[in-house]
Every structure is written in structure tokens, then in C-alpha cells.
Amino acid sequence: VSDTGSSGGDGGGRNTGRAGRPKRTDARRNEKTLLDAAATVFVTSGVDAPVRDIAAEAGVGVGTFYRHFPTRADLIIAVYRHQVEACAEAGPALLESSATPHAALREWIGLFVDFLVTKHGLAGVLQPDSTGFETLHSYFLDRLVPVCAELLAAAAASGEIRSDVEAYALMRGVGNLCIGADSDPRYDARRLVGLLVTGLRQPH
């Protein structure tokens, strides 16, 4: 990206604004590409994955990476927020596109498990008793608990699952099942989470 500071005073504010918008759009697009790539690499290699692997996944140079995220903590927090938003937006979309509300719930819980891989990695970057960690945790709950509640309500209204399951309790249970999953190859957290979601079904 070229330096916009050399535009000079000759073109006036209007032209500079017009030229700046595409560059800001490109920067946002590059950042989103990096965040998507980092999330993918984190799931397979953990939050300590080499920067070059993330840059390669995104198809950009390491220099571009560091312009967006000077430190690993900056990257992890940005990925955390990015995945929270992606998870939140996926809920209503899955309700629209899935064959049944329970299928939407199962798919969404799978995305939530992917997110938890990144979330657990924050422990090495932010102290659990720090203000930053508490702020992110509150943000996570505020955004995702209502989405999970909407999916549960839709599945209950369709008669697929029991109606007494609380979103927070389900998410907490899924989170607990995922703890330590990346350090024990004999433990298949996804399988147990799948059994949990299946167990929500109403008996026929």
C-alpha cells in the first residue's frame, strides 16, 4: 500500500477522500483475510502457530501481517472478536438454511467448538483476572448467549428438543467438554459434544 501522506495540498480534501476510501476498504479486506486465516491456523496448530504460517494461509507477506497486528496479543484478541461476530451472525443464517432447527443448532454448536479452541488460547496472553479478559468474556456472553437461546427456542417450538434447556448452561457444558481436548489425543471432545446435542432431542 502506498504512502498517502505525499498527496500534497493540491488535490483538495474531496479527491483525497475519494482516493482514501478504496485504500481503507482494501485494508479492511486484508485484515478480514488475515483474521480468517489466523482462525483456521489456530484450530489446527494452536495460538502459538508461526506468523509465517498465518501469512501464507492468507496469501500475504509477513510485513503486511505485522502492519495489521504488531503483537501476537493484538492478533489473538482480534481473532477472538472476529470469531464471536462470525458465530453470532451464523445463528440466524443457519436457522434459515438448515433442514430443521435442531440441525441448525448442531451446526452452530460445531462452530462454537471451533471458536473455543481460540478462546482457550487467550489464557496464555491475558490473565483470567485482568480487565481485558473480563471485558472480552462479557462481550462473548452478551453476543452469543442470545443467539444460542434463539436456536434452542426454535428447536423447542418445533418439538425437536425439550424446552427446559438454558442457553448459558448448554454453552457452559460444551465449554467444559472442550477443556484440555487439544492436549490429549485420546479425548474426542467433538464426539462428546455431538452426543450432548443429540441428547437434547425429545424422545419419540
Model regions and ranges:
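Short amphipathic alpha-helical segment with a characteristic S/N-K-E followed by hydrophobic residues
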Residues: 71-76, 87
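Amphipathic alpha-helical packing segments from all-alpha helical-bundle domains
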Residues: 85, 118, 125, 132-160, ...
